[in-house]
């Protein structure tokens, strides 16, 4: 999955991916560190879909990423509501662009809730997003994390615990991030570490939920949690 950076309309992301010979790509559909996002300009969605067809990028090989501000596990009800509203906007935008996947970080309890309660809130948030985008084919894709602080998803089992509480199972999936896995303690610099990750993903989550992979280098050593 090649992460594309671009300026101007979102259709430029397709051109950027094609220029480097990517076969799949990820992108942000809005500024990743602000809550506000302008609507798509007229014609941009049609341009995006036409360029995807021209360069042979089917929807399942494009993985847009959610804002870093979104936190479905937040102990702050106001922030959770803003997060849900933002995700609904993003899911609608995905549908306008003909996309079928939307990647998010599960969130953080900020040290004020139990992990069990955080997992429940994430699943509840996903369920609300699904209900508010009824009839959409866009999946919420949960990404594994690096076990930093109170973030959820560093333990692969937590991803499955969230999925277990999601009502529309056909609209949820998982993205496996190799940098996050390395930071969480899987030493992917060795065959043994890679094998351990694969075995634990199979037993704790299940390959049937995997819809994307972020293949990233890690600046820190295994288990650095960053």
Where do the PLM segments sit?
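N-terminal pre-domain/capping segments
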Residues: 1-64, 70-92
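Active-site acidic/histidine proton-transfer and metal-coordination neighborhood
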Residues: 72-173
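Short amphipathic alpha-helices and their capping/turn segments at secondary-structure boundaries
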Residues: 11-19, 41-57, 86-95, 123-131, ...
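Short, flexible micro-motifs
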Residues: 11-12, 110, 188
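Active-site beta-loop-alpha junctions enriched in small/polar residues
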Residues: 3-7, 30-32, 66-69, 107-109, ...
């Amino acid at each position: 999955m090649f992460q594309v950076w671009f300026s101007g309309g979102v259709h430029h992301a397709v051109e950027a991916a094609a220029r480097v010979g990517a076969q799949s790509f990820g992108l942000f559909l809005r500024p990743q560190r602000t809550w506000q996002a302008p609507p798509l300009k007229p014609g941009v969605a049609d341009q995006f879909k036409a360029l995807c067809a021209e360069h042979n990028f089917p929807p399942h090989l494009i993985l847009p990423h959610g804002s870093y501000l979104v936190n479905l596990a937040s102990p702050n009800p106001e922030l959770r509501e803003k997060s849900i509203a933002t995700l609904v906007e993003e899911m609608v935008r995905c549908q306008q662009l003909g996309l079928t996947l939307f990647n998010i970080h599960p969130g953080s309890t900020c040290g004020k809730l139990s992990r069990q309660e955080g997992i429940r809130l994430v699943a509840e948030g996903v369920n609300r997003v699904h209900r508010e985008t009824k009839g959409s084919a866009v999946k919420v894709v949960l990404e594994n994390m690096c076990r930093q602080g109170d973030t959820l998803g560093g333990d692969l089992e937590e991803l499955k615990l969230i999925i277990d509480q999601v009502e529309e199972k056909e609209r949820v999936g998982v993205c496996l991030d190799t940098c996050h896995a390395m930071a969480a303690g899987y030493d992917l610099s060795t065959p043994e570490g890679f094998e351990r990750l694969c075995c634990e993903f199979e037993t704790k989550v299940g390959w049937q939920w995997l819809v994307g992979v972020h293949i990233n280098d890690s600046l820190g050593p295994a288990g650095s949690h960053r």
